[in-house]
Each structure stands twice: as C-alpha cells, then as structure tokens.
Amino acid sequence: MTQQENDTQKRFFNDNLQIVDDAIFNAMRGEFERQQHEIELIASENIVSRAVLEAQGSVLTNKYAEGYPRKRYYGGCQFVDLVEDLAIERAKQLFGAAFANVQPNSGSQMNQAVFLALLQPGDTFMGLDLNAGGHLTHGSSVNMSGKWFDVVSYGVRQEDQIIDMDEVERLAKERKPKLIIAGGSSYPRFWDWERFREIADEIGAHLLVDMSHIAGLVAGGVHPSPVPHAHIVTTTTHKSLRGPRGGLILTNDEALSKKINSAIFPGLQGGPLMHVIAAKAVAFGEALHPSFKSYSVNVVANAKTLAKTLQSNGFNIVSGGTDNHLLLVDLRSKNLTGKRAELALGRAHITCNKNGIPFDPETPSITSGIRLGSPAATTRGFLEKEFVQVAHLIAEVLDGLRNAKSDEDNHAVEMAVKKKVEDITNQFPLYSYLSTR
C-alpha cells in the first residue's frame, strides 16, 4: 500500500461528515437549527434522546443479521443477538405482552406483516376510514391495503365525531370481516378496546389494534392498553413512544407470534436494521423509567390545555377536545383552509400539518383542518403555561390571516409571532453538545 493509499484508508475511518460531504452536513445543520428554533406540533413527531441518536448512528449499521437471535443465517451475530434480545424483553415488559417482534422497519411494514400472516388477497377486513381519523394502511384505496383486500370502513358520528360502536357492530355482522382494525392517525378520543374485542369474537374475526400514535401514552399509563384485548397489537416506535422510526408487533398468542415472525422474515423483510433495533431497545428502556410516566401525564395535560385555550379563542375542536396527545382544529368557522393555516404558521415557526376533518368538504391537499400534537414540545420541557402561550400565538397568526386581504398582508403578524416563538424556544435548547459544532 502506498503512502497515499494509506492516508486515504485512514481518512475513510476518521474524517467526519463535514469533511467528507459538506452539502449533506449543511442540510443536517439546517434541520438541527429548524428543530431548535421552531415549535414542533406535528402529532406524529417527537425528539429522541442523545442515547437513542448514538445507538442509531452506531457500528451496528455494519452488521447483517437475517433471521432471529440464535437462528441467524450469518455468522458473527453474538452481539446483535444481545441487542435484539434486550429490545424484545424490554418491549414485552413495557407493554405487558408475552411475545414481541422488534424487526419491522416501519409502521406500514408491521401492518403488512399482519395482513400477510392472517389474510389472503381478496379477504375482507374493517378499519377506520381515513377521513374519520384512520391511517392509509387501514384500507385506504390508494394504499396496498385497499388494493389487495375487500375493505369495510367504519366512521364517526356527524353530531359528535365519536366512533359509532353500534355501527361498527352492525357492519361487522353484515360483512363478516376476517380482521378488524382499531386505531388511527388523527382520532383524539379513547378507544373502546373491550367492545371491539367482543364484536370480533362474535363474528370469529381477529382484532388488530394499531396503537402507533398512543403507544407512549399506553406505556406511561395514561391511556387504556389494548394489549389485554387485541389478538395482535402493532405500533411505531417514534411518535409518543419517543424512539427511532420503526415498528413493533406484540401478541399474547404463541401461535400468532410464530405466524408474525414468519411474515416479517422471510415473508416481508430480509436483514433487520440492527442499529435501529438498538435504538428501539434504548427507547424502551427510557420508557420503563418512572420519569416517562410524568412525561406522558404532561403530554396529555398539554394537549388538553392547547385545545381548551384554542376554544377560548373561538376555534372549533373536532369532538370537542382530546383524550390523548393530539387534536384536530376545524377551521371552517374562521373561513380558512388547512393548507393556508399550515403555511402561515410555518412562516411564524410553528410547525403543524394540514389535516382532513370528519366529513371534510375540501380535498386532501387543501383540507378544512389542522392537526396539532403535544409530544415533541413536551419533550423539550414545555408545560401547560407554554402551551397556553402557543395557543394564543396560533390564534394570533390565524386570526390575522382571516382578516388579511391576502396571505402577504399577514406578514407583519407572522414575523411578530416568529420573534415570540424564538424567545420561547431559546429557553428550551436541544442537544447542547451539537450547538458548538
């Protein structure tokens, strides 16, 4: 090896990202600054710990490990076996489940694995309609779940935007689905897990609960757990659970656990992402700590405070409030669309997403509402006092937008709110060890 080749080899293992790829480094730096200086209210987002970041950015990314602990198709897996075992045991302890699969790479893949394990193409299943707060993978016509299977969608009552369990029962008895899915992406109220299981048992169906949005609240003891009631429970590991992006499948049924394991590997995935599984294990360990319960209590209290304060400012909250970490704001009374509101709030450094509301007359790209969530800001240390401020800032921007002749005419209001947002976020820094790099 020449000296030049030797130097190149050393640089490969020692040069940091800024040296190797300044363009990517600068984009990442920009995203760090955005997260630091904006108030994150997207309900599906959170902020992970430094420990989770370190686990995900570790040497475990180098290791291929097809199979399961002690049943791998590659050698050299003794340490990743330890990691996956820890992730499995912590997940089981956290949620009180007998079996856990920590390998799903995403929420979509975990739900696909359940379909693969329990259904054949053309079979019938039930799920909450996307327009009522469901998820793409619960039967949307544009998703694989809606293309491969016969989907029966249930919804919410128009008068109170609450799931009509009598309608769920009627549809289930009429259509006899093999699988019923409970859970959603923008439903702000408690779910009646017990009633769903009774309906499933009555028609001989399996009950799948996708608790992706509320898993952290379940772990923290502030939301009823579906694990004692559902045949299978799936969840993403980010959102309110505050881990890396990925999936998790739980069950108390050994036979179903074997079907799930086979569906994940070799049915759907190949080698698992061991660095992500390590980060999941770290996050599960954090969620087992008593402080996570306090965090979960604050998440719900903050969401309720946000909803009540917005109501006091004349905003209509879908279903009248929230039982969890998220709320939907119906903007029709303000003569605004979700798209305009999202953009205006974004310019003021308050990040949220436009979202359809039940029986929405607008298209999905426009919407009549926005979805707001409390997990990320609560992770930063925001309490109810800060969420009262946030609600008033949202009202200031959106009332200004409503009264402006054009979006551009609201610029002064948005910039004034942006300055107030900066004053708040400066009190709650992220990853202080990164700010000097």
UniProtKB/Swiss-Prot annotation:
Cofactor field: pyridoxal 5'-phosphate
Keywords for the protein's UniProt record, in alphabetical order: Amino-acid biosynthesis, Cytoplasm, One-carbon metabolism, Pyridoxal phosphate, Transferase
Site (Plays an important role in substrate specificity): H238
Subcellular location: Cytoplasm
Catalytic activity: (6R)-5,10-methylene-5,6,7,8-tetrahydrofolate + glycine + H2O = (6S)-5,6,7,8-tetrahydrofolate + L-serine
Quaternary context: Homodimer.
Record-given protein name: Serine hydroxymethyltransferase
The species this protein was found in: Bartonella tribocorum (strain CIP 105476 / IBS 506)
Gene: glyA
